[in-house]
């Protein structure tokens, strides 16, 4: 499989030329991080000024909710940190870092979720989310939806409300969308798992 199996999920988010250019920057790495996994590396997008501009503009054009419907953007560690703050700044919103366990000083809110082999925990600082603050959760990829659903639980446990989700890439066939419930949702690119 190659870039030719990647397609734009929201055609209104970018021109065909921009979509082709953005997709051309995504590397497909077979058998990484382990055998049988087809890894989509979009780190080259961040090294390319045109690619980064296309990505940010497309994310804004494809927002699943109007900017008046959320107060802040929350990004998941690690790649959600790469575009989440830039997206938040362009929209005039604050940014909330959702970290892996043990990376933040106490007190924190924490939420654990199941992985294929074990479990993981996400955390946010105790003061990151204001009561009833409406949060747009962003991440680079949705596969099974486990980490995104845990991020929702984490935001809600801190007193916030999830306004919606936005992802750069969506792996088809893993049913990640189901884990998100009825929240507004968007992804820029789709590809087979």
From Swiss-Prot:
It is found in: Cytoplasm. SUPFAM superfamilies: PRTase-like. The keyword Cell cycle does not apply. Its main location: cytoplasm. One of its GO terms (cellular component) is cytoplasm. CDD domains: PRTases_typeI (cd06223). It catalyses: AMP + diphosphate = 5-phospho-alpha-D-ribose 1-diphosphate + adenine. Its EC number is 2.4.2.7. Keywords: Cytoplasm, Glycosyltransferase, Purine salvage, Transferase. One of its GO terms (biological process) is purine ribonucleoside salvage. InterPro entries: Ade_phspho_trans, PRibTrfase_dom, PRTase-like, UPRTase/APRTase. It is an enzyme of class 2 (transferase). Belongs to the purine/pyrimidine phosphoribosyltransferase family. Homodimer. Catalyzes a salvage reaction resulting in the formation of AMP, that is energically less costly than de novo synthesis. PANTHER family: ADENINE PHOSPHORIBOSYLTRANSFERASE (PTHR32315:SF3). This is Adenine phosphoribosyltransferase. The gene is apt.
């Amino acid at each position: 499989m190659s870039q030719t199996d990647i397609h734009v999920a929201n055609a209104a988010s970018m021109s065909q030329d921009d979509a082709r250019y953005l997709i051309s920057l995504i590397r497909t790495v077979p058998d990484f991080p382990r055998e049988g996994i087809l890894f989509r590396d979009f780190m080259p997008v961040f090294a390319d000024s045109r690619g980064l501009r296309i990505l940010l503009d497309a994310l804004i054009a494809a927002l699943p909710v109007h900017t008046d419907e959320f107060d802040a953007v929350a990004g998941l560690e690690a790649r959600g940190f790469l575009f989440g703050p830039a997206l938040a700044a362009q929209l005039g919103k604050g940014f909330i870092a959702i970290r892996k366990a043990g990376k933040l000083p106490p007190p924190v809110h924490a939420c654990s979720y199941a992985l294929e082999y074990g479990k993981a925990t996400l955390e946010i600082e105790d003061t990151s989310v204001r009561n009833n603050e409406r949060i747009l959760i962003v991440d680079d990829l949705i596969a099974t939806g486990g980490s995104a659903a845990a991020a929702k639980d984490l935001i809600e446990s801190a007193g916030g409300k999830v306004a919606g989700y936005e992802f750069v890439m969506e792996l088809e066939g893993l049913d990640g969308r189901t884990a998100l419930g009825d929240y507004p949702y968007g992804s820029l690119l789709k590809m087979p798992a």
